[in-house]
C-alpha cells in the first residue's frame, strides 16, 4: 500500500469488498475470517500465522482468541451481542459473526433483502434475511484499524497457494 493511500474505514451501509480467504481445515474459520478483515484494511497476514495467533486447536478457536489476535495486529476489536435487525441498522461492516452455533463468517453487509457473507468454507454467498435470522447466533466481532495498525504484506499468489497445499 502506498503511503498516500488512506486506510479504509468500516461501512455502516452497503457491502464491503472483502478479499476471500478460504480456510484450509474445518477448524480454522475464525482465523480465516480475521485474515479477511485484516486484508480488507490492508494488512495481509499469512493464514498459517493467523492460525497460530488465534490459538486454533482441535476444537477450533473462540471469539476471545480472535479478538486478542486482532488487537495484536493493531485492530480495535470488540465483541457484541446483536439482534439480526439491530445489526443491519447499527452494525459496521465488515465484521465477523458466529453462524449456526459452530462457524464464523465475515458479514460484508446487507443488500436489499439479503445478507452478503464471506464464508471461509464456501466463498462469497448471499442469504435471505430469513436464513440470516435463523443462523446468526447474535455474536458479532467488530474491528477497525487503531493507531498501531500498519498496512503491509501481500496476498498469496495462486502458485504459492497450490505449492503449499501440495507439500
Language model feature labels by segment:
Residues 1-167:
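Membrane-integrated ABC transporters
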Amino acid at each position: 500500500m502506498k503511503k498516500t493511500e488512506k486506510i479504509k474505514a468500516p461501512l455502516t451501509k452497503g457491502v464491503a469488498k472483502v478479499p476471500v480467504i478460504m480456510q484450509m481445515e474445518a477448524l480454522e474459520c475464525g482465523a480465516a475470517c480475521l485474515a479477511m478483515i485484516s486484508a480488507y484494511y490492508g494488512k495481509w497476514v499469512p493464514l498459517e500465522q493467523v492460525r497460530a495467533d488465534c490459538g486454533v486447536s482441535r476444537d477450533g478457536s473462540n471469539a476471545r482468541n480472535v479478538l486478542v489476535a486482532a488487537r495484536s495486529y493493531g485492530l480495535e476489536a470488540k465483541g457484541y451481542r446483536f439482534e439480526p435487525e439491530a445489526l443491519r441498522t447499527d452494525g459496521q461492516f465488515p465484521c465477523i459473526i458466529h453462524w449456526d452455533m459452530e462457524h464464523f463468517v465475515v458479514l460484508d453487509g446487507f443488500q436489499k433483502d439479503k445478507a452478503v457473507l464471506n464464508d471461509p468454507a464456501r466463498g462469497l454467498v448471499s442469504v435471505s434475511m430469513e436464513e440470516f435470522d435463523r443462523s446468526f447466533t447474535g455474536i458479532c466481532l467488530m474491528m477497525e484499524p487503531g493507531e498501531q495498525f500498519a498496512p503491509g504484506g501481500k496476498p498469496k499468489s495462486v502458485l504459492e497457494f497450490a505449492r503449499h497445499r501440495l507439500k
